[in-house]
C-alpha cells in the first residue's frame, strides 16, 4: 500500500502570495477512509473574499491591464508551465487527492493526467485565440466594415465541488485564464488540498500576482460573498441544484452572468439485442460505481429490456461482488470511501427509504463487513423500483443504482425522460440505428452510445433542465469567459445622407 503523503499547511493564496485568514479560523481535514484528522485548511470569510477580488481587479483593471492585454501566446506559456509542473507532481498530487477525498489512488492518478491535459488544451486554444481576433463579418452593404473582438469577461468567481477537486477546478481555471480573465477560486471545504497546491504551482512558475487567487472555506462564509460581490463579473459553479438556485438569485441582483453545472439522475437504457452481456454490464458499473458514484452525470437509473433483465442483473451482481473495496491507497482498489460522514449518512438514508418504500436491495446497502471504519458503502443495486420512489427521482451521489424494466422502445424513452434533470443519458444496443434514435430523443446535454461516462476535454459538457445551463470543456469552455464585441466603421468619404445638409453661411 502506498504511504500517505505529508500534508502541507497552506494559507489563502491571494495576490500571488500566502496569507492567513482574516479571522484566523481553520477547518480540519478528515481522511474519509480512516476518519483521522490529517491537517487543516484556512476558513476564509467575506473579508478575505474582498482581498482576493481586489487582487484580481488591478491585474485586469476592467480589461485594460497586462493579463487581459497579453497575447494568447503569452498566456499559453503560463498554462503550459502549469501543466508541466502538474505532470512532474502527478504521484504526489494523486496521493494528496486520495487521502483528502477517499477516491482510489488509480482514479486520482487518472484525474491528475486529465488536469495536465486540460491546461495543455486551453494553452493551445489561448494561442489560437490571437488569430481569431478582428474576424470580419460579411455585410450586404459596402459603406460599413465590421469585425468582432473577443475579450475577457473580467474577474470571475469559480466555485467548485469535492468529487473531482482539482480536475473540476481546472475545468474552470484553465479556460478562464486562457481567455484573459482573473479568477477567484473557491473549492469545496471537504476537499481543498490539491487546489491549494495549484496555488503553490502558480507561485513556482511565476504566474503574475493576482491572476489566480484561491480561497478555502465554508460556502456561506466564502462562497456566498463571491457570488454577490459587485466586482465579480461572472460566476461559474458546479455543485448541487439547491446551491445553484441560491447563486442565481445573488447574481440576478446585479444581472451577473452565471454558468451552472448541477445535479443529475441520468438513465442508461439497455436493450435485449446485446450479444455480449458482460460487455454491456461493465458500463452501468462504470456509470454508477466509479468514483463511488459521486459523479453528477452518474447513470444511476438502469433501464433494462424485460427479455434481458434477469441474466443481466445476475451478472451485474456478480461484477459488483468482485469489486475490490479497500483503503483507497491499496493497490487495485476500485471502490474507496465516500467523501464525508454527512454524505455517508445521507446515502444510507436513501437506501433505507428505498427499502421502506418497497424496493428490493439485490446487493449491497451497507458498510463492507471487512472495513470497521471509514465512510465506505457497498455498491448497491435496487430493483422493484417505481417512478414515485425517492430513489428514482432524487440524486443520491453514491454507489447506488436503481433498476426498472421496460417492454418497448417508446416506454424506455418515456422512463428515461421522467426526471427533472437533464445532464446525461446513455443507450446500450447492438443496433446502431436504434442508438441514434434514442440519442436524439433523450432530453440531456450529453448522450453516450454503448458506453457511460467518457469525459473528453475537446467535447462540450453540460446539461438541461435542473442540471443547469452553459457548457464547459472544448471551445465552449473558453467561450464561457469571453465577451463578444462588435466593431463597425463607416468607410465612405461622402456623407451618409440621411438628413438634409444645411446650407453654408
UniProtKB/Swiss-Prot annotation:
Reactions catalysed according to its record: betaine aldehyde + NAD(+) + H2O = glycine betaine + NADH + 2 H(+)
Transmembrane segments: none
Residue numbers marked as site, Transition state stabilizer: 163
GO CC annotation terms, alphabetical: peroxisome
Localization annotation: Peroxisome
EC primary class: oxidoreductase
Keyword field contains Cell membrane: no
Keywords per UniProt: NAD, Oxidoreductase, Peroxisome
Disulfide bonding pattern of the chain: none
Residues that bind NAD(+): 239-244
An example molecular function term from Gene Ontology annotations: betaine-aldehyde dehydrogenase (NAD+) activity
Gene3D superfamilies tied to this protein: Aldehyde Dehydrogenase, Chain A, domain 1, Aldehyde Dehydrogenase, Chain A, domain 2
GO BP term, example: glycine betaine biosynthetic process from choline
Motif residue range(s): Microbody targeting signal: 503-505
Keyword set includes Oxidoreductase: yes
Alphabetized InterPro entries for the sequence: Ald_DH/histidinol_DH, Ald_DH_C, Ald_DH_CS_CYS, Ald_DH_CS_GLU, Ald_DH_N, Aldehyde_DH_dom
SUPFAM superfamilies assigned to the protein according to its UniProt record, in alphabetical order: ALDH-like
Subunit structure, as described in the record: Homodimer.
Protein family per UniProt: Belongs to the aldehyde dehydrogenase family.
Protein name in UniProt: Betaine aldehyde dehydrogenase
Originating organism: Hordeum vulgare (Barley)
Amino acid at each position: 500500500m502506498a504511504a500517505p503523503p505529508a500534508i502541507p499547511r497552506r494559507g489563502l493564496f491571494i495576490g500571488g502570495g500566502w496569507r492567513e485568514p482574516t479571522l484566523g479560523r481553520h477547518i480540519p481535514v478528515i481522511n474519509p477512509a480512516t476518519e483521522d484528522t490529517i491537517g487543516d485548511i484556512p476558513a476564509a470569510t467575506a473579508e478575505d473574499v474582498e482581498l482576493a477580488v481586489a487582487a484580481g481587479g488591478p491585474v485586469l483593471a476592467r480589461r485594460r491591464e497586462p493579463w487581459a492585454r497579453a497575447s494568447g501566446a503569452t498566456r499559453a506559456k503560463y498554462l503550459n508551465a502549469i501543466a508541466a509542473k502538474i505532470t512532474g507532481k502527478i504521484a504526489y498530487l494523486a496521493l494528496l487527492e486520495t487521502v483528502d477525498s477517499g477516491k482510489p489512488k488509480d482514479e486520482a492518478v487518472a484525474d491528475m493526467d486529465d488536469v495536465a491535459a486540460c491546461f495543455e488544451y486551453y494553452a493551445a486554444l489561448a494561442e489560437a485565440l490571437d488569430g481569431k481576433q478582428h474576424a470580419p463579418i460579411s455585410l450586404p452593404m459596402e459603406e460599413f466594415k465590421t469585425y468582432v473582438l473577443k475579450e475577457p469577461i473580467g474577474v470571475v468567481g469559480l466555485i467548485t465541488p469535492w468529487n473531482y477537486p482539482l480536475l473540476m477546478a481546472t475545468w474552470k481555471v484553465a479556460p478562464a485564464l486562457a481567455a484573459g480573465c482573473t479568477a477567484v477560486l473557491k473549492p469545496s471545504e471537504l476537499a481543498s488540498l490539491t487546489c491549494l497546491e495549484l496555488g503553490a504551482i502558480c507561485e513556482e512558475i511565476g504566474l503574475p500576482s493576482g491572476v489566480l487567487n484561491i480561497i478555502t472555506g465554508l460556502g456561506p462564509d466564502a462562497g456566498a460573498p463571491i457570488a454577490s460581490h459587485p466586482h465579480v463579473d461572472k460566476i461559474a459553479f458546479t455543485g448541487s441544484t439547491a446551491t445553484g438556485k441560491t447563486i442565481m438569485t445573488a447574481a440576478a441582483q446585479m444581472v451577473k452572468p452565471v454558468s451552472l453545472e448541477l445535479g443529475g439522475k441520468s438513465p442508461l437504457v439497455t436493450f435485449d439485442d446485446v450479444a455480449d452481456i458482460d460487455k454491456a454490464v461493465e458500463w452501468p458499473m462504470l456509470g454508477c460505481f466509479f468514483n463511488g458514484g459521486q459523479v453528477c452525470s452518474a447513470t444511476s437509473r438502469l433501464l433494462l429490456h424485460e427479455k434481458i433483465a434477469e441474466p443481466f442483473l445476475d451478472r451485474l451482481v456478480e461484477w459488483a461482488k468482485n469489486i475490490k473495496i479497500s483503503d483507497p491507497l491499496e493497490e487495485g482498489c476500485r471502490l474507496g470511501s465516500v467523501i464525508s460522514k454527512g454524505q455517508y449518512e445521507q446515502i444510507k438514508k436513501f437506501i433505507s427509504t428505498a427499502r421502506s418504500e418497497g424496493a428490493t436491495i439485490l446487493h449491497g446497502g451497507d458498510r463492507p463487513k471487512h472495513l470497521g471504519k471509514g465512510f465506505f458503502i457497498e455498491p448497491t443495486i435496487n430493483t422493484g423500483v417505481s417512478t414515485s420512489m425517492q430513489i428514482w427521482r432524487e440524486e443520491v451521489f453514491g454507489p447506488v443504482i436503481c433498476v426498472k424494466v421496460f417492454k418497448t422502445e417508446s416506454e424506455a424513452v418515456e422512463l428515461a425522460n421522467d426526471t427533472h434533470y437533464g445532464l446525461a443519458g446513455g443507450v446500450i444496443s447492438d443496433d446502431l440505428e436504434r442508438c441514434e434514435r434514442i440519442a436524439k430523443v433523450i432530453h440531456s446535454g450529453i448522450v453516450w452510445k454503448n458506453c457511460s461516462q467518457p469525459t473528453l476535454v475537446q467535447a462540450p459538457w453540460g446539461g438541461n433542465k435542473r442540471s443547469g445551463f452553459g457548457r464547459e470543456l472544448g471551445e465552449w469552455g473558453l467561450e464561457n469567459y469571453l465577451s463578444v464585441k462588435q466593431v463597425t466603421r463607416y468607410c465612405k468619404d461622402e456623407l451618409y445622407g440621411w438628413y438634409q445638409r444645411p446650407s453654408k453661411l
